[in-house]
């Protein structure tokens, strides 16, 4: 049977083929997007908790009995808490350095800050360094080395900004690490302009593996503040229990990285099994309280329950 190109039946077959092709491409795209999310099916919830006094100094010597954990407003009973460790636990971190075109005048400063952070690593800690412009690239893999890779000194600022994709890639890399304390340190001066991933999905991916995000605003001190960019970096930090550092420069930026490294070395880590064992994939609100009212506590605000 030979069909004319212009026959109704031939046109119908072409239309059906086009629809099927579209569905196939859509399924592939959805699969790729699903692959961007780290799936964690463990029932163990890990909280990395920072405790400071009114002067901002880290508070050592607290016991598990000093902490109260609330999930969706309900206290976690002591028998469900399976782990508690203090400052000596190792951490794994990823430094994300923005190398997009707008970072041209700030790239050397960002590199200097990364060097300062690596210099504060303890022997048991590891860090990796990634850059992100129009694409995300690994500059150096996880190690306890305090030296920045020589290729970092040949970096140039160019291209768009893939901040969200960089956070997702960092979370995926950290998911394979055995350390319970995980952190992502972001140095950026602008909004995401080129990622496949949304900001919410990037935060969700970081929360899924228990990573704390520290957002360092690299906008020039003498330039206009980008309020949307600031809000994004603040959101990364606040929702994951990290800190936002506003537009530092020179020594202030290097000090900020020193302080972040010190904070990671002065956290408490608490692991527990939820009383609510429903595997519904829903968000559970988290709150940690401390027995001493003069102290301040910071940790992530939620986690997503496993599904299925």
PLM feature spans:
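Generic N-terminal leader/processing signal
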Residues: 9-12, 26, 180
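Scaffold/interface architecture of coatomer-like assemblies
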Residues: 29-308
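Intrinsic low-complexity/disordered segments
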Residues: 3, 27-30
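Bacterial N-terminal signal peptides
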Residues: 14-26
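N-terminal secretory signal peptides that target proteins for export/translocation
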Residues: 1-10
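Short amphipathic alpha-helical "recognition" segments used for binding
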Residues: 12-14, 47
């Amino acid at each position: 049977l030979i069909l004319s190109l212009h026959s109704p039946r031939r046109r119908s077959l072409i239309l059906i083929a086009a629809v099927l092709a579209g569905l196939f491409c859509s399924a592939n795209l959805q699969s790729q997007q699903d692959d961007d999310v780290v799936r964690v099916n463990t029932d163990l919830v890990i909280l990395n908790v920072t405790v400071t006094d009114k002067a901002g100094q880290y508070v050592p010597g607290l016991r598990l009995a000093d902490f109260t954990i609330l999930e969706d407003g309900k206290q976690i009973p002591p028998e469900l808490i399976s782990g508690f460790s203090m400052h000596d636990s190792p951490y794994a971190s990823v430094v994300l350095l923005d190398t997009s075109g707008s970072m041209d005048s700030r790239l050397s400063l960002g590199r200097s800050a990364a060097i300062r952070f690596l210099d504060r690593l303890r022997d048991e800690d590891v860090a990796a360094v990634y850059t992100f412009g129009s694409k995300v690239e690994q500059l150096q893999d996880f190690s306890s080395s305090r030296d920045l890779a020589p290729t970092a000194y040949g970096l140039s600022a160019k291209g768009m900004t893939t901040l969200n994709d960089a956070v997702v890639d960092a979370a995926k890399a950290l998911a394979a690490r055995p350390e319970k304390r995980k952190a992502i340190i972001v140095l950026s001066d602008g909004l995401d302009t080129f990622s496949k991933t949304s900001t919410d999905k990037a935060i969700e991916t970081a929360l899924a593996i228990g990573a704390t995000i520290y957002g360092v605003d690299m906008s020039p001190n003498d330039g206009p503040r980008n309020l949307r960019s600031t809000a994004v970096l603040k959101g990364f930090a606040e929702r994951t229990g990290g800190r936002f550092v506003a537009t530092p420069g020179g020594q202030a930026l290097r000090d900020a990285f020193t302080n972040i490294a010190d904070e990671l070395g002065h956290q408490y880590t608490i692991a527990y099994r939820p009383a609510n064992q429903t595997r519904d994939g829903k968000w559970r609100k988290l709150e940690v309280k401390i027995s001493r009212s003069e102290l301040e506590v910071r940790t992530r605000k939620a986690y997503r329950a496993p599904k299925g």
